[in-house]
Amino acid sequence: MSKATKYDPKKVERQFYQIWETRGYFETDGNKKIQNGKTFCIMMPPPNVTGRLHIGHALTFTLQDIMVRYKRMDGYETLWQPGTDHAGIATQNVVEKQLLSKGIKKEEIGREKFLEYVWKWKEESGNAIVTQLRLLGVSPAWSRERFTMDKGLKNAVREAFVNLYYEGLIVKGNYMINWCTHDGALSDIEVEYEEKEGALYHIKYPIVGSDEYLVVATTRPETYFGDTAVMVNPNDERYKHLIGKKVRLPLINREIPIIADEHVDMEFGTGAVKVTPAHDPNDYEVGKRHNLPFITIFDENGILNEEAGEFAGIERLEARKKVVEKLEQEGFIEKIEPHKHQVGHCYRCGNVVEPYISPQWFVKAEIAKEAVKKANEGETKFYPPQWLNNFNAWMRELRDWCISRQLWWGHRIPVWYCRACGHEWASKKEHEESCPKCGSTDIYQDPDVLDTWFSSALWPFSTLGWGNGDWGKGVKWFEDDLKKFYPNDLLITGFDILFFWVARMMMMGEHFLHKLPFKDVYLHALVRDEHGQKMSKSRGNVIDPIDTIEEYSADALRFTLAALAVQGRDIRLSKERLELYRNFTNKLYNAARFLQIHQEKFDDLQNIQIKTDLGKYILSRFGLAIQEVRNNLNSYRFNDAATTLYRFLWGEFCDWGIELSKVNKDAIAELGAIFKESMKLLHPFMPFITEFLYQELSGTSIEENESIMIQPYPKAAPIDEEIMKRFETIIDAIVSIRRAKALIDMANKTIPKVLIKGDLEESAKAYISKLAKVETIEFVSEPAENAVTDIGNYVEVFIPLEGIDLTPILNRLNKQKEKLQKEIDKLSRMLSNENFVKNAPQAVVEQNRAALAEAQNRLATIEEELARLTR
């Protein structure tokens, strides 16, 4: 083994990964020698081709890889299905910007030419995130990698759409939708709401046939050109006499009725509400209830149309200022007051979203009924379980899903129209030649594309061959894949896409295959900085996973994320944690170096007999660790599994096993075999260093030996309760002696004698003497007089004070006592001052009270020590 005192991950990570992938270990038959007939399937949430690996990705893929490596080593035929998403809006935006930088507008070159540019960009730049994933050490079946717009998945998308179309579950109609003037139609969950400081404009609407006017309050005065009624509550005494009359819209003089509706909140604004059915979702419903006209006042780009009179041709938000100015000039503004309200923004570009009536394609909400029913029957289990409640709450409010997007890049909606006879039909073919009804060739395809999430919703089964036709058969998927791997065993993803993606996969999977697509769904929380702040470029607290791998290693990053992944809690990631687990890799490396000083290579644990008591003790501790790690992984408690591994390898094996073996060198061969086996237990979390140390301790190299990743995962080792109790008592004695020595400033010195009261055998003396630095150990049955005492869990220890010069110790304690007494006096005076307690900030007062209590406790401890040493 290298003489270097630190492990160098850069020397092994890329080399090992290339060997693993080249040998096919990531494929479903990569572990065929140990397969037991069970299967395990997990889907990679397909990252966007525009994406770069961020820390949230690193968490998702680390947790997935831990489960995949665990199941693979445990004999399962394992499929981790990789792939990327075409990311409609994001990808089109990237390519549009590139072309604009060259002076090219997509409209000038047309759809087909533009799509050629997109495909070219995808081939050249769209796999950056896949390259970055390899640096993390993940092990999906790369040979099966899919792309949401590969030919097979295009076939599957058409299959799904056409079936839903003819079942009446996909329909087209004029709906009130969320409209981004940059990115087009958005589904409800693609709109992000932020509280904004705005204004509430009180506008005077003249009452027809009267000198009076009705005041309405609105946050969007530019939309009043689309008003078709003013609405009041029928129980509002202020306005009862006006119901049925009309008002005249300022500036444009169009008359609209005053109507009554119990939905009006009499407390909001003036209690009179403008009704704009074409530009407000609530007004849309009012318009339908009262048969009001629907007047659209701006186009797809947010430009006001002729309905706005002199303001036609002005962008909507710019028009707001001009409309208000004009209304003020004409005396139609009663007042403007500050008003906080929720404003919807496009999740992709940040534009203010407008409610807008537009002909769009929708998936009807009824498709979700069976999926919700089966989820609540337990067909899918959520981890943490409270996410089922969130799922149910969202599904109760589910509306029809708008799936059409006004883009060029994406799955083209497979609906065709005949200009000759007006026939409309959906087709599973990529191209149609003629109308099936009249035979005319004057046909055209719907220009819109599908929401990216539509193809993603098919991911758990389309990647397994469903609807693919023959494309990719025998390469990307095989005849029995769907039967073998559907439903998938597990999905791991962030909670933030539960509704974007997870719920929709459940709808589609249940509808087409009559089973929910996952047995278990694990939803992890957000990765935040060490202070719990969300990471953002503006805050300067972003932790880049690629930079982190470069500085700390992939293993350190993976283990840190796993150790912090408590179910239901956000992860607070810090450099201190990363350093801690980088130090862990060095601790493991140096443990192996120590073992190899005594013996160059070690047998497999299964091939040796453990004879020494120390070997039996460490094997028993290892057996308990195996049980805990397996139980925790099986219930997705990644943090608990990582904590167990860290505690066993550092706290038990390195801190005690190795140190105790310096007394009993006969145990080193046994400890080496246990340590080598423990690398298998750790491997799913830290694949690189475990491979390195496993090969080193085997006396070979990965070039000439099979990888650790296809070795059987450790099963329970024998646990000897009697041996464990014996060594726990020895360790307790050592720790107690060290504490007692520290009290008399002799922590690092050898002392002549210690008396121990407890259940210990003669063989324990050698261990205690060596590790506690004591010349003579004597077992006693009664407490000793004139001695420093420490009481442990199983023993009491006594260090006789005879012959020990206590003067320096007493001087130190008396100085500490004097200093603490002054501090207590000062704090007591401050807190007894009524003016201070009354006028100082409450937090400062509480801080001083806590400081006083702490100082008093420390003084009591020192006085106890002085009393003990001067008895």
Swiss-Prot record:
Any one GO molecular-function label of the UniProt entry: ATP binding
Coiled coil location: 805-871
EC number, UniProt record: 6.1.1.9
Binding site for ATP: K537
Span of the annotated motif 'KMSKS' region: 534-538
A Gene Ontology term for the protein's cellular component: cytosol
Location of the protein in the cell: Cytoplasm
Alphabetized UniProt keyword annotations: Aminoacyl-tRNA synthetase, ATP-binding, Coiled coil, Cytoplasm, Ligase, Nucleotide-binding, Protein biosynthesis
Cysteine disulfide partners in this protein: none
UniProt signal peptide: none
Pfam annotation, one family: Anticodon_1
PROSITE patterns, sorted: AA_TRNA_LIGASE_I
Position of sequence motif 'HIGH' region: 47-57
GO biological process per UniProt: valyl-tRNA aminoacylation
HAMAP family, per database record: Val_tRNA_synth_type1
Family: Belongs to the class-I aminoacyl-tRNA synthetase family. ValS type 1 subfamily.
Domain notes: ValRS has two distinct active sites: one for aminoacylation and one for editing. The misactivated threonine is translocated from the active site to the editing site.
Job description of the protein: Catalyzes the attachment of valine to tRNA(Val). As ValRS can inadvertently accommodate and process structurally similar amino acids such as threonine, to avoid such errors, it has a 'posttransfer' editing activity that hydrolyzes mischarged Thr-tRNA(Val) in a tRNA-dependent manner.
Protein name: Valine--tRNA ligase
Gene expressing this chain: valS
